[in-house]
Amino acid sequence: MIKWPWKVQESAHQTALPWQEALSIPLLTCLTEQEQSKLVTLAERFLQQKRLVPLQGFELDSLRSCRIALLFCLPVLELGLEWLDGFHEVLIYPAPFVVDDEWEDDIGLVHNQRIVQSGQSWQQGPIVLNWLDIQDSFDASGFNLIIHEVAHKLDTRNGDRASGVPFIPLREVAGWEHDLHAAMNNIQEEIELVGENAASIDAYAASDPAECFAVLSEYFFSAPELFAPRFPSLWQRFCQFYQQDPLQRLHHANDTDSFSATNVH
């Protein structure tokens, strides 16, 4: 029998957090009871260690907080919560937000412009999100804002900037870079053939290695059936890094559902 961590001594808490309801999103339904229990344990610690800061009138209730924490902890389910130790706050806008962006062109001229962002991740600062895109991250669709920004945090543990290569053994770096760049080239070829809107993988993945790692991390957890057959070698590297196999998890869940359906009387 599974002992759910949020059910232990609930009477001791003034308000028990709604973990069971928080788990009832499509992205998390494939997890086993043991995995869900472990995920909740991590998420509870996450909420104790991190500060969720609602901005611009956004209302943050306990269910929303729990779901945000669960999504943050899914990528580190087997790595451990210490992999998320590079920040202390999560800033949450109600919708995509406008920021001032400064960049330098090829001849050294500095440009300033205002751009709309869904999220941001600073190496030694907070993660910035928006609720509209967080909600869109609940489905198993290939899009997940929180996992994307977490991937950037995991990426920067390997150095001063995001490079697309997370903290892995040095002997594996060359192979990782080879497979990641091959995936970027493949995605770019598809974009040139069918256009960005018709591409089967988010075109942002072709922009640079750091974004490729972040985007494919989204697909790894929320659309493994698209990632695994297309980039099998890179898929295995992701499985080894995250110490999870979401495709195997999905197949097991589907097999269980099929077995249950055939035994209904």
From Swiss-Prot:
Disruption phenotype: Mutants exhibit increased generation times during growth on glucose, reduced transport of methyl-alpha-D-glucopyranoside, a substrate of the glucose-specific EIICB PTS system, reduced induction of a ptsG-lacZ operon fusion, and reduced catabolite repression in lactose/glucose diauxic growth experiments. Changing E149D: Retains 59% of wild-type protease activity with L-alanine-pNA as substrate. Does not affect Mlc binding. Binds 1 zinc ion per subunit. GO terms for biological process: proteolysis. The two functions, Mlc binding and proteolysis, are clearly distinct from one another. Interacts with Mlc with high affinity. This is Mlc titration factor A. It comes from Escherichia coli (strain K12).
